[in-house]
Amino acid sequence: MSTMSDLFPDLVEEILSRVPITSLKAVKLTCKQWNDLSKDSSFTKNHYGKEAKEIQVIMICDLKACLMSVNLHNHKDLADPSIKQIGKLNQVEIDSVFHCDGLLLLLLCNPKDNSKLMVWNPYLGQTRWIQPRNNSHKHRPAGRFNHRPAGRFYMGYDSNNNHKILWFSSMYREYEIYDFKSDAWTVIDVNTDQDHIIDNQRVSLKGNVYFIAHDILKEEAFLLSFDFTCERFGPSLPLPFHCCHEDTVLLSTVREEQLAVLFQKSDAYEMGIWITTKIELNIVLWSKFLKVDMTLPNSYWFEDLSFFLVDEKKKVAMVSELDIETCKNYKTYILGENGYYREVDLRKSKGCVYLCVLMFQVWCKSSKVPVLARCERK
């Protein structure tokens, strides 16, 4: 009698290539041969390349992390977005999320243990719990939850692909690094300019974290990076525009290869989006991606933008802002060239699409194969 182990390798690979990412973990347990094949680099590259035709994003829906699949152009008429839920983390309530190379760093909403962190790999269903140092992570009333840490957490990796977590408090000028390999926190000595304020706009790209920062004396914004190999902040890098603290500046990534920045001036009816043509720790070059004239008919002035995505192929951007009237739902729009403008009601889509006020970050996974780094401790 034949068994699954007797199947030809090509046939097994074809079978596994048709399995959705969210079901792959269960399938791997079927037999050792299937488990070994799923870990093969050539297979994962081909398999996840097929899965990446749609943009995958993380949304915080009713304090739960949901893995969503977004298609900005189902049809040929530029953009016909759809959205569906393909995964959900139900066990915990989440305050904030930070994405790094396929892994998610979650800060939990737990009054009894208010500094608990979880790292989640939604593709493999793996989780890892991390406890910050109690004596250093001071808590102060802030925002929606008064147990939120005064500092912030960010994740990246060094030149050896070893993942790390950065915690720092701008208020107290304190910095710590958590090393996944050693499972330990270390206090680091980092010199930062007292006149610089680091904004909450931040993204991970190629292992480093990039921030929007403000120079108080010069009254201008700039790009700042943190290098997890050297465990130091990089030099100030220019943005492709001059802005003040009242203007809207958002960061995003494109295919995990480039940075994108959105700029809306507080006193002008115009929005611009730029994409990097070169990005390193000490140099950045920008190219204009999209210009939106908000004086045109049917256009709209955005009051509280929270995130955006770009689709280079269709030359469109998806932006979202908090609904001021309800302070709960998010309004989403598709913007394009020549005055293209369309409002999208994601609440009509299937799946978990009710977005609460804490949903402030979206991450794009397009053409690049996600790194399937393991979260669990050895």
Curated annotation (Swiss-Prot):
Domain F-box: 1-47
Coiled-coil region: none
Highest taxon of source: Eukaryota
Protein name as catalogued: Putative F-box protein At5g51000
